[in-house]
């Protein structure tokens, strides 16, 4: 819930929507999540909010997207290069070398060839950049790789997301088998919960850290809040939280669902607002931490730039 709230609040902050919309989105998140949790029954699909028309429309558009749409929305052109700016940053020589070596490995070649039958195992790294992806990239390895699969006119362009896998925050169930490698854990979990996504993911290591590589498809593009009206954004927040609540409920027994519901409704609500204060304060604090860290990074970069200019 906190992670979804942070994503929605960050997206709303970067849109033209008024700040009060964020508060209403968090409110509706609580309602949607709680409804899915309380309405779930073992063995069935539970009670979930009907999908708003705006979500159905966006999903329809996403499924109809082609590579050029993905390129336009993520790298702003259809040439084999990634323009640097606020979303994409230049890499060090070490990063460039390590990522190039990663895509020269037989395992990754075979994986990409399986995703693109008929194009062979020849891979060309056209460009790579550090990807500034909100809270998930702060202090972590996160890269966008513009990759070509195949030769010449038969080459197929694709965008590969490389993301550092971190230690799980949630405790494991007693006696449950869990991979020791965080990247392997993430991939196995994705293949179990969302096979269509998980089958496009591969675990590996980069710069001594576990990473997950995933080919992005056009329909993977995130929901852009600035495409929505204030009312639509609030409806979308409620529906997305309902989906999360449904997923969480399916992993709990009745006692655990009851405890989670009581936690969601416990004291701490203020000024007549329904969202628990712990949810709101967590989202606000995380946004503040992220913004402060980003500005501190910019300050350090400016200092280094001044030193290079003076040298």
Protein language model regions, located:
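Acidic catalytic cores of enzymes that act on phosphate-bearing nucleotides/polynucleotides
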Residues: 59-136, 146-148, 154
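Conserved ATP-binding subdomain of kinase catalytic cores across diverse folds
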Residues: 1-63, 117-303
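Nucleotide/phosphate-binding catalytic cleft detector across ATP-hydrolyzing
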Residues: 311
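Extended, alpha-helix-rich binding/interface surfaces that flank or overlap catalytic cores
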Residues: 306
């Amino acid at each position: 819930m906190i992670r979804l709230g942070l994503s929605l609040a960050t997206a709303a902050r970067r849109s033209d929507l008024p700040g009060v919309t964020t508060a209403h989105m968090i409110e509706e998140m609580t309602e949607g999540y709680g409804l899915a949790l309380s309405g779930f029954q073992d063995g069935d699909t539970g009670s979930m909010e009907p999908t708003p028309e705006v979500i159905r429309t966006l999903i329809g558009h996403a499924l109809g997207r082609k590579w050029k749409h993905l390129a336009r929305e993520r790298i702003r052109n259809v040439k084999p290069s990634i323009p640097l700016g606020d979303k994409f940053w230049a890499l060090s020589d070490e990063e460039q070398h390590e990522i190039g070596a990663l895509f020269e490995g037989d395992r990754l070649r075979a994986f990409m060839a399986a995703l693109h039958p008929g194009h062979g195992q020849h891979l060309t790294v056209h460009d790579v950049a550090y990807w500034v992806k909100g809270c998930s990239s702060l202090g972590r390895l996160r890269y966008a790789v513009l990759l070509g699969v195949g030769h010449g006119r038969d080459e197929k362009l694709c965008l590969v997301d490389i993301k550092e896998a971190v230690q799980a925050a949630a405790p494991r169930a007693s006696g449950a088998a869990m991979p020791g490698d965080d990247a392997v854990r993430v991939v196995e979990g994705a293949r179990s919960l969302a096979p269509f996504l998980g089958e496009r993911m591969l675990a590996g290591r980069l710069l001594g850290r576990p990473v997950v590589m995933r080919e992005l498809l056009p329909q993977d593009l995130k929901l852009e809040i600035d495409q929505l009206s204030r009312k639509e954004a609030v409806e979308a927040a409620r529906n997305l939280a309902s989906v999360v609540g449904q997923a969480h409920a399916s992993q709990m027994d009745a006692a655990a669902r009851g405890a989670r519901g009581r936690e969601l409704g416990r004291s701490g609500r203020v000024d007549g607002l329904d969202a628990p204060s712990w949810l709101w304060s967590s989202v606000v604090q995380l946004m503040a931490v992220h913004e402060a860290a980003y500005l501190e990074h910019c300050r350090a970069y400016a200092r280094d730039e001044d030193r290079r200019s003076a040298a």
